[in-house]
Amino acid sequence: MSSEERSRQPSTVSTFDLEPNPFEQSFASSKKALSLPGTISHPSLPKELSRNNSTSTITQHSQRSTHSLNSIPEENGNSTVTDNSNHNDVKKDSPSFLPGQQRPTIISPPILTPGGSKRLPPLLLSPSILYQANSTTNPSQNSHSVSVSNSNPSAIGVSSTSGSLYPNSSSPSGTSLIRQPRNSNVTTSNSGNGFPTNDSQMPGFLLNLSKSGLTPNESNIRTGLTPGILTQSYNYPVLPSINKNTITGSKNVNKSVTVNGSIENHPHVNIMHPTVNGTPLTPGLSSLLNLPSTGVLANPVFKSTPTTNTTDGTVNNSISNSNFSPNTSTKAAVKMDNPAEFNAIEHSAHNHKENENLTTQIENNDQFNNKTRKRKRRMSSTSSTSKASRKNSISRKNSAVTTAPAQKDDVENNKISNNVTLDENEEQERKRKEFLERNRVAASKFRKRKKEYIKKIENDLQFYESEYDDLTQVIGKLCGIIPSSSSNSQFNVNVSTPSSSSPPSTSLIALLESSISRSDYSSAMSVLSNMKQLICETNFYRRGGKNPRDDMDGQEDSFNKDTNVVKSENAGYPSVNSRPIILDKKYSLNSGANISKSNTTTNNVGNSAQNIINSCYSVTNPLVINANSDTHDTNKHDVLSTLPHNN
């Protein structure tokens, strides 16, 4: 059924017919496409047509709606009007004015709250309708749309300069949710444009509407239409409070919307409102009155600026601190028309104030939720950062108080540790110097002992050389051996061979033997005396057989220790007592008398001399004279004992 046919229906509509049925609303479809609040899609109108509607379309539908409004009688004056629809469903069906008519489609704003009942809070009467009776027509204006410009931003729905819901043009916080240029006005039409001029019927009709059943749910949260909230994603008009002083011609200009503390400029945005007598209505009233709205935002989705950081907390603060005084404007409008309606309007305005404060706390869409999460994260991060900074400052203060003595203790400990380290270093240096000094002294002593030992060895060598030379000369004379000119050279032994021409007369031992063999005792005694003289001239006989090294150790007391060490370490030096004495076997002098005379020949004497020479080099007792075996002294007396001694 078209809107023209509905407008021709009888105007007998009861209050019961206007009451929405919750049971029917529970079956209402919520899968339909979302539309911006303030723009209600008519079943017979497509989206593109609703976006591009002109002012003539608004005028046509406004005439139809006004005819329906004038045909509804007034009833109880204390009934309230709601301006909110169900929150849980995006679109809800509203009751039709006449039985049998097709119910218009009610599109709720995209403020969806999970849970709650299907009942909606009562609708708020638009303050601009209250001033309908006092408003005057302006025949010079031809447009019925509301245009918003960014040339001079001011409050569009939150405040009005005179007699609106918000009498003050600015909130105490100095900000408003929606800005509008003060010179942008909404035009109203006169009777010549097709609108009735009976202004008293509209408030009466609205006040005679019974309760629509759209009451708050159990959680006391409004879930229906929420006029007055303009978010970044859904920039729909809310509660346009425009009085007769601000009604001027509209212009298609740019719009500057201040959202969350940032100004957004959106060119060519035309906001169209459903109007009754040229006065805009709220989306809830337009749906209840079966008024199709053709006003569409040209650019419904706006991009948020990077500086948009304020969230619903700022919205709540700006709204709660803006000193809402709907009672003042409501009282001023109602007292001029009907004093009986004053109480109901005041009550509804009070309810609207409470519901408005609750509604502003609800997030409008997913983007708003995301921004809220971001804000919470930023707030939590900033709060944690501030807490951390406070803790750090407190800890720095405490540490500044506690570190003063701690630093002193550390300095003292460092000094002590440094002193200990210095002492340890000095001790190590002292020990090192002492060690080096001991090594130096030991090295010097060792060098000194080495020099002394070398000198001692040289002296020993010289001593043994002199002793060797002395003994060599004596033994050479006794044996008839002529030593060489040099003591270091090999011995040159000239042994006389037995021959007739050269008897062995050079050997004293041989001469003595020959004298004895001839029984020439006088010659024998002379040979023995010579031999005794040679032996007495030796150094060994003069020392009495003592070791000269022992005498040197006794004379030099300073070298006693070194000498003992040398003796113990050098076992190659034989001791004095271990040296054999050559003349340890003595023979008696009277043994020569026992020698028997024999008629031996010279050959026998020669053999005896040869045996004597051989015995000097091979026999251990070279001084034993080997006589004939039959003439050998059986008593074994020492022969040298009979030799004369030169005392």
Swiss-Prot record:
General remark: Present with 504 molecules/cell in log phase SD medium.
Modified residues (Phosphoserine): S94, S399, S558
PROSITE patterns linked to this entry: BZIP
Regions of compositional bias (Polar residues) in chain numbering: 51-85, 357-368, 396-405
An example Gene Ontology biological process: negative regulation of transcription by RNA polymerase II
Biased composition (Low complexity): 138-194, 305-329
Organism, as annotated: Saccharomyces cerevisiae (strain ATCC 204508 / S288c) (Baker's yeast)
Family: Belongs to the bZIP family.
Membrane spanning residue stretches: none
Residue intervals of the bZIP domain: 429-492
Sites bearing Phosphothreonine, chain numbering: T113
GO molecular-function terms, A-Z: DNA-binding transcription activator activity, RNA polymerase II-specific; DNA-binding transcription factor activity, RNA polymerase II-specific; DNA-binding transcription repressor activity, RNA polymerase II-specific; mitogen-activated protein kinase binding; RNA polymerase II cis-regulatory region sequence-specific DNA binding; RNA polymerase II-specific DNA-binding transcription factor binding; transcription corepressor activity
Lineage per the UniProt record: Eukaryota, Fungi, Dikarya, Ascomycota, Saccharomycotina
GO (cellular component) term, any one: nucleus
Chief location category: nucleus
Name recorded for this polypeptide: CRE-binding bZIP protein SKO1
